[in-house]
């Protein structure tokens, strides 16, 4: 039998170990961490912490207590940069705008005469069948998803669902809304139960703000890489004004390399001083030699910034979806979706790859020069 003093010492050590684990997790909330107890990679989310008032008894005899499951909701997709560039083009060319407006057919709404009743006593507009179903019925599967006792909340839900979503989405499939459409088949209508309660509206998460505006036009981008690509692609002349700050003051910049744990004063692999490059989205740092960067990459990231592998997004569309379709340039380390390139690529090249901007800037010194 263990003594009381020994038991208290074990509890103190356990508290210290838990506090160190939680402190390490709080420092890196944006990245998945490896849980040694379950041997899985987990990600911090609002579902991690549960209160006592969230518990409710389960109908399953093998379950003592369970928590209500919360449905995952995808944020609204941002408008593509092509729409912004098109609006800028039409603003500078009003004659083209007038021609488009002239060719576009105008949709005329129904008049009250066409929808009025045949009798002269009253004039009413009859609501459609779908509107009546939305007001009088509520779909059962929405309640089943929220209150089903067979589904249990877990710390791994957020991480695993994100990985599955990335793997299943194709390059052509684009999600425009997270609201499920109610099928209009006879079998689905028969499952609807009458209810006069107010239909609960779907709450969307606020989309990420575009905090990198262009100093020459009204275009805005979510990442500095997208802004740099926009300025190089649309504005050929070099801007006389200084570029926006590469790193936000709200980001905590790491002063040590994530690969060799060295600093700017000494690289532990080469035993020589070497400047660190930091991600402008999360603040993680690394030595260019530890990242296997060549001189071209170092030159570009000093001017345009750098994104680490976890924060990497497509420079053209600005999203990080379909990361298995991302192609990285060997001269600037920017990421491009295979289907966002012009012309689009079916698969990544077997040898080195250089984007169009690097081929123009470095010429024959690029990793993959343009074919003449």
From Swiss-Prot:
Subcellular location as annotated: Nucleus; Cytoplasm
Keywords, sorted A to Z: Cytoplasm, Metal-binding, Nucleus, Repeat, Transcription, Transcription regulation, Zinc, Zinc-finger
A biological-process GO annotation: chromatin remodeling
CC per GO annotation: cytoplasm; nBAF complex; nucleus
Organism: Caenorhabditis elegans
Pfam family, one: PHD
Compositional bias per record (Acidic residues), positions renumbered to this chain: 142-158
Gene3D superfamilies with a match to the protein in the record: Zinc/RING finger domain, C3HC4 (zinc finger) (3.30.40.10)
Protein name as it appears in the record: Zinc finger protein dpff-1
Composition-biased stretches (Basic and acidic residues): 132-141
Domain of life: Eukaryota
């Amino acid at each position: 039998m263990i003594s009381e003093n020994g038991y208290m010492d074990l509890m103190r050590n356990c508290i210290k170990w838990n506090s160190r684990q939680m402190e390490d997790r709080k420092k890196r909330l944006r990245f998945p961490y490896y849980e040694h107890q379950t041997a899985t990679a987990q990600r911090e989310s609002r579902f991690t912490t549960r209160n006592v008032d969230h518990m409710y008894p389960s109908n399953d005899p093998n379950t003592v207590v369970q928590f209500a499951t919360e449905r995952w909701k995808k944020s609204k997709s941002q408008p593509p940069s092509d729409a912004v560039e098109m609006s800028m083009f039409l603003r500078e060319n009003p004659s083209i705008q007038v021609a488009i407006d002239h060719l576009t057919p105008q949709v005329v709404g129904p008049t009250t005469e066409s929808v009025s009743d045949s009798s002269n006593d009253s004039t009413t507009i009859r609501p459609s069948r779908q509107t009546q179903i939305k007001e009088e019925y509520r779909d059962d599967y929405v309640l089943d998803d929220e209150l089903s006792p067979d589904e249990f909340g877990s710390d791994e839900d957020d991480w695993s669902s994100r990985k599955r979503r990335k793997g299943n989405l194709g390059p052509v499939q684009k999600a425009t809304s997270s609201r499920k459409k109610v099928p209009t088949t006879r079998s689905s209508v028969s499952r609807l139960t009458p209810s006069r309660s107010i239909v609960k509206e779907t709450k969307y998460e606020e989309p990420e703000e575009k905090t990198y505006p262009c100093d020459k036009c009204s275009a805005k981008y979510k990442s500095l890489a997208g802004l740099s690509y926009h300025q190089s692609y649309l504005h050929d002349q070099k801007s006389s004004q200084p570029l926006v700050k590469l790193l936000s003051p709200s980001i905590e910049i790491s002063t040590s390399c994530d690969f060799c744990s060295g600093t700017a004063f000494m690289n532990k692999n080469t035993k020589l001083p070497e400047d660190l490059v930091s991600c402008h989205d999360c603040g993680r740092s690394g030595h260019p030699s530890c990242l296997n960067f060549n001189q071209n990459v170092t030159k570009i990231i000093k001017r345009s910034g750098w994104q680490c592998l976890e924060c990497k997004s497509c420079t053209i569309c600005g999203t990080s979806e379909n990361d298995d379709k991302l192609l990285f340039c060997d001269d600037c380390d920017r990421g491009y979706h295979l289907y966002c390139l012009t012309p689009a690529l079916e698969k990544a090249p077997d040898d080195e790859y250089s984007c169009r901007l690097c081929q123009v800037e470095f010429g024959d010194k690029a990793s993959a020069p343009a074919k003449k």
